Amino acid sequence: MRRPSLTRLRRRLPRLGAKLQLGQGLKRAKRLLLNQRGDGVHSPFAFGLIHRVIRNRRPYYCFAPLREELRTSARSLSQEALRSPTALELIYRLLQELRPSEVAYRAAAVSMLPHYLEQSGLPCLRLEPQTQELAPRSCLILESWPTEGAELDELTHQLQELCRQSPELMLFVHLSRPRLGRQLEQLRAELQPQLVLDLLDLQLWFFDPSLTPSRYKAVY
C-alpha cells in the first residue's frame, strides 16, 4: 500500500482545516437554535444566566484596550491560554453578574486572563500549579490544568476536597483542545457538579445543592 506523499498531505491540510471549521460552525449554529428561546432549559438559574450573560455581548469600557493588547500579544501566549476575546469577555461578564466573594485561578504561563480578572474589581488570587493547594473559594477558574497521570489525580483530589469545603463553588474550566474532552468528562464524573453549562471550549460547573440538577449545551 502506497503512503501518501508529503506534497499530497500538504494539499489536504487546508481542506481538513476547512472541514473542522465547518463542523464547529454547524455545532454552534445548532446550539444557537436550541438556545434561542431557552428550549429544554428547565433550571431558572441556567435560563437567566444563558440569556442575561452568555448570550448578551454587552461591551464594557475596558474591553477595547484589552482586545488591542490581546491582538498584539497573541503570538507570545502559551499554547493552552485563552485566545478568544469573546471567551475572556464572557468570564469577565460572568464575574460581574455572579459577584463571587473570592476568585482563584490557574492560568497558563503567558496569558491574558489575569488582565481581564484585574479589571473585574474582585479579589483574585493566582495559584501556581503544583505548588499551591486549592484553599476554599467561591469561584475557581482553570485556564490551564494537568490532563494526565499523577498530576491530574492530584488535581481531582484537591477539587473533591474543595467541593466539600465550599459547597456553593463555581468552577470554570477551559478546554484548550477538543481531544481533552475525555479527561474533562472523567473529571466531571468524579466531581459531580449540580449544574453544568457546556459552551464548547468553556465548561461552567456549579455545585450549589439548591440548583436544579441539570446539564445544558449553549453557545456565546
List where the protein language model places each region.
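Walker B catalytic acidic pair
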Residues: 173-175
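A short alpha-helical cap/connector motif
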Residues: 1-139, 145-166, 177-220
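Short glycine-centered segments of the SAM/dcSAM-binding site in methyltransferase folds
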Residues: 168-171
